């Protein structure tokens, strides 16, 4: 039986650059030298409202342990210092990709914050910047037709989970804030085979830029 599907894909690929909001290198798999313990609490937004999903997570009252090495994390990752200006090298890489995929660069790149209190980010939110939007020329041709590209973003990666228990979770901070390019398509994929073909094509195109890391996250 042929299954009808309507699918969009989203890629998150690490960039070959230092971290997004500090000068730490993107060194992975370093053994932690130190551990800190935190408990994240929910607060109201600028509109005085509480995020429902964040409220549910806060009610679990979990303890978060963070391991870090001074060669790959600093006070910014620990949320003990404000973020530095956005990594311009990473931004330039994503701007080049926008031209490569024939997307329209936005007039002003602004960093947005998404509430995340599952412990994967010490600050309690993830930073993302919209860099480009799709145009009629922004598409990937497949054997089953065109698939439109919708958005291109620059964002920070989350911390790496080491161990998870009922009321306690442990993370490593070497991965936190590594710059990622995020590319999203329109939901125009009509079969699993087309999705696989598209994923392979976009992955190859990104690697050909020479500006992305290889391997699984």
Label every model-predicted segment.
Residues 1-217:
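Basic, nucleic-acid-interacting segments
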